[in-house]
C-alpha cells in the first residue's frame, strides 16, 4: 500500500492510498473532525460507512462536494478537504466532470457483495443466468473484509465470469415497481492520475431484473445516553475494522458495550 499526501483544514498529512479518510485522520491523531452546527460541540469519527453521523467534511479538490462522511472518502494523492460545521458550500466553478447513464436487463440482481451476496452470485452464475452484483463498499467481502479475514478465492473468481457484472462503489438508491432499481456508481473519485478523459465520474444504472436478492447486511446504531456524540465514542464494528484492517488503534483504555462479537474483536 503506497503512501499519499492529503490536506485537512490547511495542514498536510500522509496516509495510505485507498484507505478511508477517517482512518487517515485517526492515524494522524486527529480526534476532532468537526463541530456541531449551533452549539459548536466537538465531534469525531463514530462509524465506518454511510451510518457516520458526525464526521462530515467538504471536499475542495477535484469536482468538489459538500457534506460527505469522512468514512466514505477514499484517500488519493492531493486530496483537499476541510471540516464542516453545518451546511456545506456548493462549488462555484463549473463541474467539468462527465456523468452518464446506462440501462440493463438482467436475470438476477444482487444488492450487497458481502459473504451472503458473493455466495448467491456464485450459485446463480453457475446456473448460467445473467447476474449483476453491486455493493457500495470499496471492495467485496462485507464484514469479512472489514476484519481483514481471507475470502474464499472461488467466491471472488465467480465475479469474473462472462455472465456476471460486478460493481463496487455502487449504491442502490431506489427499488421500484416491476423490479426496477436505480443505482449510482462512483467511477473515478478513488483514482488520481489514472483517470481517462472520456471516463465519466459517476454513472447512473437503470436496472430491470427478473429477480432481486437483497444481501445488504446491517449496520450498528449508537446507544442513547447523554453526550453520546463526543469524540472518542465509536461503534464497535468501526473500532474493530480500523484496528484489524487499517492498523489504526482508536483507544488505549475504554469501556466497551457490545451485543455481538465485534466488541470482543
Regions found by a protein language model. Name each.
Residues 1-265:
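Residues forming the flavin
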